[in-house]
From Swiss-Prot:
Keywords: Glycosyltransferase, Purine salvage, Transferase. The record marks 189, 244 as: Important for substrate specificity. This is S-methyl-5'-thioadenosine phosphorylase. Belongs to the PNP/MTAP phosphorylase family. MTAP subfamily. GO terms for biological process: L-methionine salvage from methylthioadenosine; purine ribonucleoside salvage. One of its GO terms (molecular function) is S-methyl-5-thioadenosine phosphorylase activity. Catalyzes the reversible phosphorylation of S-methyl-5'-thioadenosine (MTA) to adenine and 5-methylthioribose-1-phosphate. Involved in the breakdown of MTA, a major by-product of polyamine biosynthesis. Responsible for the first step in the methionine salvage pathway after MTA has been generated from S-adenosylmethionine. Has broad substrate specificity with 6-aminopurine nucleosides as preferred substrates.
Amino acid sequence: MINKHFSSEEIEQDGKSCLLKNARLGVLGGSGLYSIDSIENIKELDIETPYGKPSDSLRIGNLGGMEVVFLARHGRHHIYTPTEIPYRANIWALRSLNVRWILSPSAVGSLQEQVRPLDMVVPDQFIDRTHQRPLTFFCDGAVAHVTMADPFCPTLSRLLAEEGELLMPEARQVHKGGTYLAMEGPAFSTRAESQLYRSWGCKVIGMTNHTEARLAREAEIAYTSLSMVTDYDCWHEGFGNVSVDLVIENLAANAKLASKIVEATAKRISKLLPPSEAHTALKNSLMTSKDKVSETTREKINLFTENYWGKFNK
């Protein structure tokens, strides 16, 4: 049921760009976005990974002229907290289905006055304040250090922001760039924490994107976020504190628009097949010699290392 994964050897160089053959677009839907109605000819796959089961079935279909794989990160019935999401299983499953780009529509709180509820942000940096999650595939005797200087793919982010600006109502705004503060959750911030993150210059606060971005980079998948602003966290004296009701209300108002932006971006990706530095992220990142890595670990990470270490056979 699962197609052969897409390796860097299948990238054709033409001197200016590279053609990614048969690659798919992944969409990781967050709170309030558990499906995209415009995806056609959907087939569902249940995949078992070396890291357990993903959050939900993976739905493969057509959107914007290309094949996409949709996955609800919290599960379609929202059963996983941000800490409990099986991030490694999700990213492994997407890569096993030839996903080489990921768009991540996600709920966030605003940490800056000018970034208003119902605006959207395409961040370009993050600060990680989580402490309970596995953040790498490379452990248990295999070490890799990928570059995370630019954690969100600049090319993918530009396409997403451009399509967002075209579709956004005049009263709202798409903000290009900014730092995403990643908190553990599931509780929202204290007022002191919210003010601290503001003093750092962070633009939005969320609970999931940085974990996905790290793992996607190791999996050589280009990743970017469409951060949908639902509230002002708890720092703004002129607005009520963030609550589940407020988040859900504003997400419902933004869900259709976010789906349209994702579809429009998918159309751009299907035409451009944009290359990304993320697609060869492991090229100069693998530290451990393959002959020093156990068979168990080699088998788990073979999906990512085959192009550099050769195919693993027991």
